[in-house]
Amino acid sequence: IVTAKYWHQAEDGGLHFTVAETGWAKASWGKIYGQWLIGSAVMVYDFDNFDPKQLTSVINHYGVTSFCAPPTVYRYLVRKGIPDMPTLKHASTAGEMLAPEVFHRFKEQTGLWLCEGYGQTETTLLMANFKGDHAVEGSMGTPSPFYHIELRGKNGKTVENGEVGEVVIIPEKAGRQPGVFTAYLDDEEQYRYVWRDGVYHTGDAAYMDENGRYWFHGRFDDIIKTGGFRVGPYEVENVLMEHPAVVECSVIGVPDPLRGQAIKAVIVLDTSYEPSLELELEIKNFCNQKLAEYKWIRFVEFVTKMPKTISGKIQKHVLRSQNESL
């Protein structure tokens, strides 16, 4: 109900469409049941290949009123031009970081606020920019009333506002929390690891501002450790997305004998640009002028497409595995 009514803002008599494989956990709590319970019909459309252009045709053909999709879909739309979607009243996104540029351009072209949310396969919706609260670009929003959430440091203690910590869930009852998974199939060791010290460890890093809003810093697996600093990839990616040549990007850490890890940008170019050394230097300079020196991009790779999940989420672990011996 929280997801459907207060994040997706699905309506009684409306038609909701979430881009999520129907075999996923999110399909049950973020695509079907909550929307039904508040009286909305549900658009179920599974596809073999990710095609954002096709999604807008579906929205208009069937008269979708509320829509949720990964940022990849919205990035494509603002780059290629958003067609008129007169029935669409509410738009939301989750799955990876949404660049501020995409947030603002979508608002300019449609008049709709993109409401970000955050959750995991192991949970339901944990945080979001909820109905009645002004959506803020880049923010995970505020916690769902269903959960007690804290940010904790390596010492297990709650961090101060503005400090990065791990998102953890404090269960209502000892060792149990409604809405959180109860086991990993055939992996009891991993289950005990994430449910340690009496709390559930998400593995996600974030910080909270003075207004109680949370901001994603990165998966701990994705955070780049370079020259003694810890860099969240999304800050660098947001700057990259401001360059007109960049359609998609993913920032990863690659082995570096001097720094431990160096920052590498994997980039899909707009069709009006061609890969070249000159363009690589231009993009590096464009970004590095806006970033602290320890966040500078050291390597660039141009690719024609990114490895993605069926819903369009970029798979950073695949990119990292391809660059282990760089």
Regions found by a protein language model. Give the residues of each.
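Conserved AMP-binding/adenylation subdomain of ANL enzymes
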Residues: 1-65, 80
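Conserved ATP/PPi-binding loop(s) of AMP-dependent carboxylate-activating enzymes
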Residues: 146, 157-193, 231
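AMP-binding/adenylate-forming catalytic core of the ANL superfamily
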Residues: 67, 177, 190, 205-295, ...
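Active-site glycine-centered loops adjacent to acidic/histidine catalytic or metal-binding residues
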Residues: 21, 95, 119, 141, ...
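Short Gly/Pro-enriched turn/cap motifs at secondary-structure boundaries
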Residues: 138-143, 194-198
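Gly/Ser/Thr-rich phosphate-binding loop
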Residues: 11, 37, 64-69, 78-136, ...
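Conserved beta-loop-beta connector loops within the AMP-binding
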Residues: 150-171, 207-211, 274-280, 315
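Core-facing hydrophobic residues within beta-strands of well-ordered domains
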Residues: 85-88, 246, 297
